[in-house]
């Protein structure tokens, strides 16, 4: 069945043909954190690196001078807003929004391949009664970092 799907032009989302063949080593410095949220830069960067390697097979190169590509990110905004409340008036559901500026450059050809000044990821999450908000928020950020990375890398690979 897989061969028949491949024969008809079917391909998995996130495995598009956009990825430049010369892009073997990519430098991904830690995202700049203009949001003020502690360690968000480290979590997003780590997740983006993991997703980029998994989807493209590139090697992460810490030295920009030896890299074929450069992915820069700046976390502009991080907001958590209550959107639902329990009968006692306590927030039970939150909306988490991360806005970043992202630029991916082909260093071999000196060409910007992807640029988005307001790359936005939104996620909603529940807070169970009696659970500490801070620990729930930290767990939500860990999950959101992975989903953010997946969305960003799919956009890079698909060429949007």
Where does each model-flagged region fall?
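Bacterial Sec-type N-terminal signal peptides, specifically the leucine/valine-rich hydrophobic h-region
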Residues: 2-5
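A structural "domain/chain start" motif
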Residues: 7-50, 54-62, 80, 108, ...
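Conserved acidic
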Residues: 36, 40, 92, 136, ...
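Surface-exposed short loop/turn segments
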Residues: 55-58, 66-114, 118, 122-135, ...
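Compositionally biased, intrinsically disordered linkers/stalks adjacent to structured regions
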Residues: 134-160
